[in-house]
């Protein structure tokens, strides 16, 4: 007897291998934002940890958006997984996450 089983092929999903790279880029952006927190325009009037709380809240919103944008980009445009492309996608997600901070913060004021 033959059984008809459906095979899930991960090579068809072009966006799947790049999710980890975009997440690493977002973590790099969070690290840079925390390191340069004093130079970012977030006021410290609410206490010492107010700036870190604002950074974490904004990044919890921007990280899924950035990962979805990178996944959509990789799904539409087939980007082979080479080391140069991985580094560029990591930098792109880092830049988008930092840009998301500067876009989202004035709206939340």
UniProtKB/Swiss-Prot annotation:
Subcellular localization(s) per the UniProt record: Cell membrane
Keyword field contains Cell membrane: yes
Taxonomic classification: Bacteria, Pseudomonadati, Pseudomonadota, Gammaproteobacteria, Enterobacterales
Coiled-coil residue windows: none
GO CC terms, sorted: plasma membrane
This protein's UniProt keywords: Cell membrane, Membrane, Transmembrane, Transmembrane helix
Entry annotated with the keyword GTP-binding: no
Lineage top rank: taxon: Bacteria
Bilayer topology annotation: Multi-pass membrane protein
Protein name: Uncharacterized protein YpfK
Main location: membrane
Residue ranges of the TM segments: 16-36, 52-72, 87-107
